[in-house]
Amino acid sequence: MKSYLVGGAVRDALLGQPAGDCDWVVVGADPAHMKSLGFKPVGRDFPVFLHPKTGEEFALARTERKNGHGYRGFIVNADPTVTLEQDLQRRDFTINAIARDQTNGTLIDPYGGVNDLEQRVLRHISPAFAEDPLRVLRAARFMARLAPLGFSIAPETLAMMRQMAANGELNSLIPERIWKELSRSLTYTQPAAFLHTLRTVNALEVVLPELNALYGVPQHADYHPEIDTGLHQELVSDIAAKLAPGDMLIGFAALCHDLGKALTPRATWPHHPMHEQRGMAPTQQLSERLKVPRNYQQLALIACREHLNVHRLSKLHDNTVYELLQRCDAFRRPERIAQLAIVCEADYRGRYGHEDANYPQGQHLCRLHAAALAINARDLNRQDLHGTQIGEALAQARIRAISSAGVYDGGTGTNF
């Protein structure tokens, strides 16, 4: 029996990146032997064990053979005779098929992963890559993480991914797996690479049709030099990732904010009147299909509905600002206003030539919200107030606080 460090921990160390969890593969053992050493079995589909002291995962070396459709149709063999090289061959990409012998530091790299790391190439290991449709999403997610390091996908891997999309393999992916890969991509610095990769291999229209529909929809060049709404969406996603690193909640809201532009009549192009309202339905549809957490869906709907109002904040009357805060449930969920402000700033800056633009509307919205939030029912003289009068008086007091918070010379955002 011998164990090797494998996968992401080895890859990230070679890239000089912070390593995540350590995963180990065990050669020459069976489940009974692992249990006798105190390892706790946790794997449902294949033998995985937790180390009795460190809690790290140790998986028996295994092979996988396709016997059905989709990503679950595999026969697993974890016999003690399975070699390390056989286990590494079943993995997705060469850069993930590198093992390290921790006793002497030797790298075991039978499929050229070290060279691909040096060349910054994401390459599949074998034709078996095509047997698991989830790997198309994993490739896109890896690009969201690795594109900033200069990585690209090997041409032969792109070709295989296109074929997988064309033959319908991706239709077997369940919503939870799509959401898992999408949400993880939103934690990286270049989530647009996730969308771009899927679009390149014709997979975006299968797994995220609401987003795919944005591509090819023109915007007014005076306000959107990038013109294409899909490209605007990519820019917004990357700006959001910079403004709120690792924040999936803000990332998802930014992803959904302009879905309505795909539904505006062609006769109005490149203008998109009412796209905020039109975007509510596809945002809800996408959220429900992927079984997105409710708080994600709620913020996405708020961003979709309110982003133009925030852009033109300086033109809104005090009572209109108060109504905006109420629609956001901002007095019970105060964190939403800062989140909305970030999404709107990403929208404003997600345009060619505006990536570093100042966005005072966001700070001003937070300032107005803070002024209104500071007023509560205890501050009112309630001697002569009863029932609904208390709520009405509180609303008026908060509107006065908004009015007293000052104004600024901000943009209108009318043409967004």
Curated annotation (Swiss-Prot):
Cofactor note as given: Magnesium is required for nucleotidyltransferase activity.
Residues annotated as binding CTP: 8, 11, 91, 138, 141
UniProt keyword Hydrolase, yes or no: yes
InterPro entries documented for this protein: CCA_bact (IPR012006), HD_domain (IPR006674), NT_sf (IPR043519), PolA_pol_head_dom (IPR002646), PolyA_RNA-bd (IPR032828), tRNA_CCA-adding_enzyme (IPR050124)
Catalytic activity: a tRNA precursor + 2 CTP + ATP = a tRNA with a 3' CCA end + 3 diphosphate; a tRNA with a 3' CCA end + 2 CTP + ATP = a tRNA with a 3' CCACCA end + 3 diphosphate
One Gene Ontology MF term: CCA tRNA nucleotidyltransferase activity
Pfam families: PolyA_pol, PolyA_pol_RNAbd
Residues binding Mg(2+), per UniProt: 21, 23
HD domain segment(s): 229-331
Top-level taxon of the source organism: Bacteria
Cofactor dependency: Mg(2+); Ni(2+)
Protein EC: 2.7.7.72, 3.1.3.-, 3.1.4.-
SUPFAM superfamilies named in the record: Nucleotidyltransferase, Poly A polymerase C-terminal region-like
GO BP terms, alphabetized: RNA repair; tRNA 3'-terminal CCA addition
Function (record text): Catalyzes the addition and repair of the essential 3'-terminal CCA sequence in tRNAs without using a nucleic acid template. Adds these three nucleotides in the order of C, C, and A to the tRNA nucleotide-73, using CTP and ATP as substrates and producing inorganic pyrophosphate. tRNA 3'-terminal CCA addition is required both for tRNA processing and repair. Also involved in tRNA surveillance by mediating tandem CCA addition to generate a CCACCA at the 3' terminus of unstable tRNAs. While stable tRNAs receive only 3'-terminal CCA, unstable tRNAs are marked with CCACCA and rapidly degraded.
Free-text comment about domains: Comprises two domains: an N-terminal domain containing the nucleotidyltransferase activity and a C-terminal HD domain associated with both phosphodiesterase and phosphatase activities.
Quaternary structure, from the entry: Monomer. Can also form homodimers and oligomers.
More details: A single active site specifically recognizes both ATP and CTP and is responsible for their addition.
Family of this protein: Belongs to the tRNA nucleotidyltransferase/poly(A) polymerase family. Bacterial CCA-adding enzyme type 1 subfamily.
PANTHER family registered for this protein in UniProt: MULTIFUNCTIONAL CCA PROTEIN (PTHR47545:SF1)
Name of the protein in its database record: Multifunctional CCA protein
Annotated gene: cca
